[in-house]
From Swiss-Prot:
Biological function: Produces ATP from ADP in the presence of a proton gradient across the membrane. The catalytic sites are hosted primarily by the beta subunits.
Gene transcribed to yield this protein: atpD
Organism: Leuconostoc mesenteroides subsp. mesenteroides (strain ATCC 8293 / DSM 20343 / BCRC 11652 / CCM 1803 / JCM 6124 / NCDO 523 / NBRC 100496 / NCIMB 8023 / NCTC 12954 / NRRL B-1118 / 37Y)
Reactions performed catalytically: ATP + H2O + 4 H(+)(in) = ADP + phosphate + 5 H(+)(out)
The protein's name in its UniProt record: ATP synthase subunit beta
Domain of life per record: Bacteria
Gene3D superfamilies in UniProt: 2.40.10.170, Bovine Mitochondrial F1-atpase, Atp Synthase Beta Chain, Chain D, domain 3 (1.10.1140.10), P-loop containing nucleotide triphosphate hydrolases (3.40.50.300)
Keywords: ATP synthesis, ATP-binding, Cell membrane, CF(1), Hydrogen ion transport, Ion transport, Membrane, Nucleotide-binding, Translocase, Transport
List of residues binding ATP: G153, G154, A155, G156, V157, G158, K159, T160
Membrane topology (UniProt): Peripheral membrane protein
Localization per record: Cell membrane
């Protein structure tokens, strides 16, 4: 093993020199710095500067580092535990348990976090719909088992709540393995998630990996790869169907941009790293389904300043099968989940996949909502009286549809005081077909707000009439 010394520390970036005649570590190798007092710091090689000097990114705080400290090359990239031993546990970026439930046994298999994506001939595609129980998603932007799904939204529009509800609805009914990866998000949310999973009994089938907001950019940059490596092992070596939740994929990009300038790279658009598309591609191409097993990934994507043209969310869009867009204007109307029914997309909304009736109902719902959006300018200037009878009917139905696309979530019961609702796809399609047919035109609009099945609307209308 090569040994070297720390020669420069700039924030999370550490330069290390190896003497002449020693093997210079490869790119992505993990090096261990001895900080004394039994403490060590793991860093990852990013650049070879020449003359035996390498530039590395620290996976933890560089506080207390001094020039001249000894460094050992491990000879391998960061390796994390994989397999059954990871279930029910919480790990950091290095695969070290952080849940105070004891160390992982030394004989547990470990795997490098840097791997090639599966080869083209190993891939497989699926057309099986993944039922979420959330009306707006199942109807208008359905998810595919083994697909890649993005939840896009600005700050505070409900991405994490939606991902928690999807974990509640899918992971609890899914007998396979789940991997949850917290990338640069709030530690409090991670703690809440752990306890909720523990109470619901899902934890024993779940591996959790966290690199949260308070951690250095190195940890936030690599923690997504740690979680993905654990998911890949279940897929490739155990032939399992895996659910991979990532909250938030934007922080992966953000961490890369934080260290990019320190590594000496010239920034590109909006200050992002010039390697943005490459880094995103390397991560996303590994999240896929093969002939051995599937990985269904659900990724929250923060949209800076609600700007979808920002390079980070724009780069992510290209890799996804379905997108669920959360819209701030809908939260202001009190419609939760605040999913934009016209901007959300899915490659699975196809009559050959979802069936002819589902496809026709979904497209008619979108057409009605689009017509309502076009008429809103006329309504705001001239009022409803200027519309034709047909247009008035369209507007009234569109408003009922818009309210009926909301529903109470199980994970938000403590805030709302309303029991969460899970609505099967067949029920969702039938309900919206009946609304489009005018069966419920006489019921008040407010009866459609924040309910599950259409029968609850009828009950609510009766209660309101009393």
């Amino acid at each position: 093993m090569s040994t070297g010394k720390v020669v420069q520390v700039i924030g999370p970036v550490v330069d290390i020199a190896f003497e002449a005649g020693q093997q210079v570590p490869d790119i992505n190798n993990a090096l261990v710095i001895d900080k004394g007092n039994g403490q060590s710091l793991t860093v990852e090689v990013s650049l070879a500067l020449g003359d035996g000097v390498v530039r590395t990114i620290a996976m933890d705080s560089t506080d207390g580092l001094q020039r001249g400290m000894g460094v050992v090359d491990t000879g391998n990239p960061i390796e994390v535990p994989v397999g059954e031993a990871t279930l029910g546990r919480v790990f950091n970026v290095l695969g070290e348990p952080v849940d105070n439930n004891g160390a992982i046994a030394s004989d547990v298999r470990r795997s490098s976090i840097h791997r090639d994506a599966p080869k083209y001939d190993e891939l497989t595609s699926s057309t099986e719909i993944l039922e979420t129980g959330i009306k707006v998603i199942d109807l208008l932007a359905p998810y595919v088992r083994g697909g890649k799904i993005g939840l896009f939204g600005g700050a505070g529009v409900g991405k994490t709540v939606l991902i928690q509800e999807l974990i509640h609805n899918i992971a609890q009914g899914h007998n396979g393995i789940s991997v949850f990866t917290g990338v640069g998000e709030r530690t409090r949310e991670g703690n809440d998630m752990y306890h909720e999973m523990e109470e619901s009994g899902v934890l024993k089938q779940t591996a959790m990996v966290y690199g949260q907001m308070n951690e250095p950019p190195g940890a936030r940059m690599r923690v997504a790869l740690t979680g993905l490596t654990m998911a890949e092992n279940f897929r490739d070596n155990e032939g399992k169907d895996v659910l991979l939740f990532i909250d938030n994929i934007f922080r992966f990009t953000q961490a890369g941009s934080e260290v990019s300038a320190l590594l000496g790279r010239i920034p590109s658009a909006v200050g992002y790293q010039p390697t943005l598309a490459t880094e995103m591609g390397q991560l996303q191409e590994r999240i896929t389904s093969t002939k051995k097993g599937s990985v269904t990934s659900i990724q929250a994507v923060y949209v800076p300043a609600d700007d979808y043209t920002d390079p980070a969310p724009a780069t992510t869009f290209a890799h996804l099968d379905a997108t669920t867009n959360l819209e701030r204007a809908l939260t202001q109307q009190g419609i939760y989940p605040a999913v934009d029914p016209l901007a959300s997309t899915s490659s699975a909304l196809d009559p050959q996949i979802v069936g002819q009736e589902h496809y026709e109902v979904a497209t008619e719902v979108q057409r009605t909502l689009q017509r309502y959006r076009e008429l809103q300018d006329i309504i705001s200037i001239l009022g409803m009286d200027e519309l034709s009878d047909e247009e008035k009917t369209t507007v009234n139905r569109a408003r009922r549809i818009q309210f009926f696309l909301s529903q109470p979530f199980s994970v938000a019961e403590t805030f709302t005081g309303i029991n969460g609702e899970y609505v099967p796809v067949a029920e969702t399609v039938r309900s919206f077909k009946e609304i489009l047919d005018g069966k419920y035109d006489d019921l008040p609009e407010d009866a459609f707000r924040n309910v599950g099945a259409i029968e609850q609307v009828v009950e609510k209308a009766k209660t309101m009439a009393q």
